[in-house]
Amino acid sequence: MNFTELSSSVRPEIIRATQAMGYTEMTEIQQKAIPLMLAGHDMIAKAPTGTGKTVAFGIPILSKVDPASLKPQAVILSPTRELAQQIAQDLQNLAQFLPDIKIVCVYGGAGLDKQQRQLKAGCQIVVATPGRLMDHYRHHAIDVSHVETIVLDEADEMLNMGFYKDVKQIIDTMKNRKSLSMFSATISREVMDIGWMYQKDAEEITVQPKEESQPKITQYMLETSGRNKLSDLAQIIIGECYKRVMVFCDTKFNTATLANQLARLGFSVDCLHGDLSQKERNQIMQNFRDGRLAILVATDVAARGIDVSDVDAVINYDVPGDNEHYTHRIGRTGRAKKEGVSYLFYVPEEKKRVQELLRLTRNTDLCTPVHFDFNHEHIVVEKKQDSADRFQIKCYF
């Protein structure tokens, strides 16, 4: 189904924006969700990441808000700052030919005063993390009396992160709401509870990832040890000449430690975790997107919602305890119909867990890259003068 087929119910400026963004055919979630939201139905949509959910709820919201009113009419809740920023940017792109539409994004880690000024200046759409939205509500910085549409994006993750109480309070404050839509990778007990309490005759949508639409990601499972782990990581990155790599660790401590170790080896690296200020996080992400950083080491929560194209490889330095975290991690590579590669490091005691992940991703074998000969000799690093070499190192094994 083509976006132009929505012309009878969607503003022409939005159709024009989809064309400018290079969109032609709608994804399955967009075909199913857009008509329901345009009709004002409550909805629970189960769909994996990367299926076009932002456009699925963005088009109906932009079509229904009144540009003449600068009162918030739609609120979109996101579990993380990065995802909130990404949603707001996507909505701005969809609204690029609607100059009267104002979108404000509010999240923790940034100053309240600036966000309050933006809210008081007026907008039709607010994208927010739950805690920060409640902060503004308590400070009387936002008028929610005109909000008719509420969207919970990544609802399962948001409620699992401890925002259940905040989400309930937010919905309770919006007395004039007409529709509540939840988009979620899984339908957890908490998601169902919110549905039972606040939705009426909700439409349910399930979108399964199609085999042919899944990214082509070659997955390597590497048995290693604590003593050899760093050496193995360095050999992979150098041997493959990767220019943009994401490395995932389980904890903030491991993330910072690994980033320091890689930096001492001469790699262009930084880390992303929950203890950083929003300004620091934004700068790190900008450096990574612009190519000034070759390696980004991150925790799962800190990396949630990050959208970076052309990630050459994802390396799971620690085995994730959650299946969803693994699929979200490796989904950072192999985007835009490009082939990707991921590596999972594990110790012998974790082999059973790795086999579970293999079944999850329909892999059948534990495989190590045949093009590497891990001899675990000491790494010697030399600085190179060639500024075009982003790693700035030379290694001998």
Please state what every model-predicted region is.
Residues I379-F397:
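Non-catalytic terminal extensions of ATP-dependent helicases
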